[in-house]
Amino acid sequence: MTHQTHAYHMVNPSPWPLTGALSALLMTSGLIMWFHFNSTTLLMLGLTTNMLTMYQWWRDVIRESTFQGHHTPNVQKGLRYGMILFIISEVLFFTGFFWAFYHSSLAPTPELGGCWPPTGINPLNPLEVPLLNTSVLLASGVSITWAHHSLMEGNRNHMLQALFITIALGVYFTLLQASEYYEAPFTISDGVYGSTFFVATGFHGLHVIIGSTFLIVCFFRQLKFHFTSNHHFGFEAAAWYWHFVDVVWLFLYVSIYWWGS
């Protein structure tokens, strides 16, 4: 972006939306190729181009905001509205999965044996790994709030410590979820119980990985002194997203693990 004399969010033409769309096409096509023909070539190509696009797009945004000063108060306000709308769209996305779950579980059909969980399904014990996962995510919610308050108070060391703890808890959650999937006595193909369980918890797990990536980027940016107490929207957006992931898990735990078992 060349020199600008206004306070609004008008960026230069960028190739990244196009390469991002093409990488998404490659990933979805690659997923189909993997499922039907057991070939991962297209999927790997899609993932690689997607990672490259994300890296270069975020690099441009960081340059515009941190080094060129284009993220004026007006621009930050617009970005906040954008992030709020994005989180609302994610809430609606998960509402669809909860709707599918309750539609199937509140009035089980004769094919399911007229009961929930369906006949033949051994559900996971909600007081074992799922409860540990809940406490891990709740603890990460506390540590991200600690990081946010430390940043606003200008305490860089505490902010980095709290952010590192949050990332570690996010990675721990992902490992626990992976071990739970590995040991689960049912699969995604075990009727409506398996499909609603794995799709809802799997998409949540994907969001935890995305949120952890977001926080890792913030961690490295803070190591380079990118955030100040009054200019840190990148971190704020990551914190909002992490709280959203936290709340969704509480609903998943109460609905699918505890009530649904």
Curated annotation (Swiss-Prot):
InterPro entries: Cyt_c/ubiquinol_Oxase_su3 (IPR024791), Cyt_c_oxase_su3_dom (IPR033945), Cyt_c_oxidase-like_su3 (IPR000298), Cyt_c_oxidase_su3-like_sf (IPR035973), Cyt_c_oxidase_su3_a-hlx (IPR013833). This is Cytochrome c oxidase subunit 3. It is found in: Mitochondrion inner membrane. Component of the cytochrome c oxidase (complex IV, CIV), a multisubunit enzyme composed of 14 subunits. The complex is composed of a catalytic core of 3 subunits MT-CO1, MT-CO2 and MT-CO3, encoded in the mitochondrial DNA, and 11 supernumerary subunits COX4I, COX5A, COX5B, COX6A, COX6B, COX6C, COX7A, COX7B, COX7C, COX8 and NDUFA4, which are encoded in the nuclear genome. GO terms for cellular component: mitochondrial inner membrane; respiratory chain complex IV. It is an enzyme of class 7 (translocase). Belongs to the cytochrome c oxidase subunit 3 family. Keywords: Membrane, Mitochondrion, Mitochondrion inner membrane, Translocase, Transmembrane, Transmembrane helix. The chain crosses the membrane at residues 16-34, 41-66, 73-105, 129-152, 156-183, 191-223, 233-256. It catalyses: 4 Fe(II)-[cytochrome c] + O2 + 8 H(+)(in) = 4 Fe(III)-[cytochrome c] + 2 H2O + 4 H(+)(out). Residues 35-40, 106-128, 184-190, 257-261 are mitochondrial intermembrane. Signal peptide: none annotated. Component of the cytochrome c oxidase, the last enzyme in the mitochondrial electron transport chain which drives oxidative phosphorylation. The respiratory chain contains 3 multisubunit complexes succinate dehydrogenase (complex II, CII), ubiquinol-cytochrome c oxidoreductase (cytochrome b-c1 complex, complex III, CIII) and cytochrome c oxidase (complex IV, CIV), that cooperate to transfer electrons derived from NADH and succinate to molecular oxygen, creating an electrochemical gradient over the inner membrane that drives transmembrane transport and the ATP synthase. GO terms for biological process: mitochondrial electron transport, cytochrome c to oxygen; respiratory chain complex IV assembly. Its EC number is 7.1.1.9.
